[in-house]
Amino acid sequence: MSTILIAIIALAVLAAVFGAILGFASIRFKVEADPIVDQIDTILPQTQCGQCGYPGCRPYAEAIANGDKINKCPPGGQATIEKLADLMGVEVEDSAHDLDNKVKTVAFIHEDMCIGCTKCIQACPVDAIVGGTKALHTVIKDECTGCDLCVAPCPTDCIEMIPVATTTENWKWQMNIIPVTDITNQATDATASEPKA
């Protein structure tokens, strides 16, 4: 047998042995995660913005499971707080960030000042900034959560947080407080109670 063939067979045997050991170890030493943390993490918006004081949504979910407040997520808003309260069996709290009076903002890059350093792209947790090295960067307004994390790393201070104008598309419609009457049952009840001729 040639030396190359022996080396290939030896490497294949070693790979199979180590693969079997790793497969056994992953099953034997598996760490079971808390299912409530997974449920909380599913409810959170996954923006990884850090506005809650934690480095991402998963650490915040773990903190909630350990008793932290459920009202620290600005991108999730009041709807997320209500879902978390329902899941955790606690009272619905008002947001810790005063979301009702806060104007939604998005990042705006003054492209005439941008040097294309990509520091803002690296800081953005939701990939709302596009551009390349030594190229102008721009913000995708619909993707930006307004977390403000891109402003500090910018060496030329060309990023500004600007308020989003309220339109019919982004206005906070409160559908759950508008009284809606189901008239389908009333119509069938009325026709059933009419005397037949």
UniProtKB/Swiss-Prot annotation:
Keywords: 4Fe-4S, Cell inner membrane, Cell membrane, Electron transport, Iron, Iron-sulfur, Membrane, Metal-binding, Repeat, Translocase, Transport. GO terms for biological process: electron transport chain. InterPro entries: 4Fe-4S_dom, 4Fe4S_Fe-S-bd, 4Fe4S_Fe_S_CS, Elect_transpt_cplx_RnfB/RsxB, RnfB/RsxB_Proteobac, RnfB_subfamily. The keyword Magnesium does not apply. [4Fe-4S] cluster 2 binds at residues 114, 117, 120, 154. Gene3D superfamilies: 3.30.70.20, Electron transport complex subunit B, putative Fe-S cluster. It comes from the Bacteria. The keyword Iron applies. Residues 105-134, 135-164 form the 4Fe-4S ferredoxin-type domain. Its main location: membrane. Its cofactor is [4Fe-4S] cluster. [4Fe-4S] cluster 3 binds at residues 124, 144, 147, 150. One of its GO terms (cellular component) is plasma membrane. Binds 3 [4Fe-4S] clusters. GO terms for molecular function: 4 iron, 4 sulfur cluster binding; electron transfer activity; metal ion binding. [4Fe-4S] cluster 1 binds at residues 49, 52, 57, 73. Its EC number is 7.-.-.-. Belongs to the 4Fe4S bacterial-type ferredoxin family. RnfB subfamily. The complex is composed of six subunits: RnfA, RnfB, RnfC, RnfD, RnfE and RnfG. PANTHER family: ION-TRANSLOCATING OXIDOREDUCTASE COMPLEX SUBUNIT B (PTHR42859:SF3), OXIDOREDUCTASE (PTHR42859). HAMAP family: RsxB_RnfB. Part of a membrane-bound complex that couples electron transfer with translocation of ions across the membrane. This is Ion-translocating oxidoreductase complex subunit B. It comes from Vibrio atlanticus (strain LGP32). The gene is rnfB.
